């Protein structure tokens, strides 16, 4: 700030702290947006201010209760590709990775562990599911568990010799699993 020929720096913290019943939450007042000017960022933040406070108060009043499991072990997407999606959800849900590695030796224990989650996210698997894994997933859904499948049934291969692209159907051994629930994925 320039006043009377003197320059002074004032430190500003672009967030507010809200508390309720001993819980505290940081409410961002300045919304980060890549590729926009400072003026646009400030204008967008002012427009978003009411929502930011309402969302912060909602998080204080209704703390995290539900749990989301992110399935790993069948060639699912790396964390860097779904980081933004889960970063948005982590303010509202508990999120943990879950593997079906122990299905072959301890299927009952694996099923009991997976039932502790309210939602199972399977993000673009690339490796086939075994019959045991499908059985555990089926039992999870049949006992009231929800699942979000992000499946790409086509694999695109670039032929380096001819320079052409070819699309092939990807067999994840899930056709019968989905068919039981009335879903059919055509590659």
Regions found by a protein language model. Give the residues of each.
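Short, surface-exposed patches at the edges or C-terminal ends of soluble domains, predominantly
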Residues: 1-187
């Amino acid at each position: 700030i320039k006043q009377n020929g003197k320059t002074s720096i004032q430190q500003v913290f672009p967030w507010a702290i809200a508390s309720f019943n001993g819980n505290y939450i940081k409410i961002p007042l300045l919304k980060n947006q890549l590729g926009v000017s400072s003026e646009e960022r400030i204008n967008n933040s002012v427009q978003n201010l009411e929502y930011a406070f309402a969302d912060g108060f909602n998080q204080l009043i209704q703390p995290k209760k539900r749990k989301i499991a992110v399935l790993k072990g069948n060639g699912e997407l790396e964390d860097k590709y779904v980081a933004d999606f889960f970063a948005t959800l982590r303010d509202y849900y508990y999120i943990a990775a879950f593997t079906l590695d122990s299905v072959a030796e301890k299927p009952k224990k694996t099923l009991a562990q997976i039932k502790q989650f309210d939602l199972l996210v399977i993000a673009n698997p690339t490796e086939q599911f075994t019959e045991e894994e499908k059985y555990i997933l089926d039992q999870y859904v049949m006992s009231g568990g929800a699942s979000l499948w992000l499946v790409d049934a086509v694999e695109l291969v670039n032929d380096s010799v001819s320079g052409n692209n070819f699309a092939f159907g990807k067999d994840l051994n899930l056709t019968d699993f989905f068919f039981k629930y009335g879903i059919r994925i055509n590659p």
